Amino acid sequence: MAKQSAIEKDGVIVEALSNAMFRVELENGHEITAHISGKMRMHYIKILPGDKVRVEMSPYDLSKGRIAFRYK
């Protein structure tokens, strides 16, 4: 069986949690917990509350995600 692709949504950082985790409010109003992707961590991209981001979520668990991109 083929692996299902990630779901991408845009959202806004609401709160910074510990261990590089963030609470993100998606466009549809849902709040999820997300962590920073490895490339963003490697390039020291800072994320602050209020930043607009793109989040990738697994179709199997829609309450968690990975922050893939921070909009300028």
Swiss-Prot record:
One of its GO terms (molecular function) is rRNA binding. One of its GO terms (cellular component) is cytosol. Disulfide bonds: none annotated. PANTHER family: TRANSLATION INITIATION FACTOR IF-1, CHLOROPLASTIC. It holds the Pfam family eIF-1a. One of the essential components for the initiation of protein synthesis. Stabilizes the binding of IF-2 and IF-3 on the 30S subunit to which N-formylmethionyl-tRNA(fMet) subsequently binds. Helps modulate mRNA selection, yielding the 30S pre-initiation complex (PIC). Upon addition of the 50S ribosomal subunit IF-1, IF-2 and IF-3 are released leaving the mature 70S translation initiation complex. This is Translation initiation factor IF-1. HAMAP family: IF_1. Gene3D superfamilies: Nucleic acid-binding proteins (2.40.50.140).
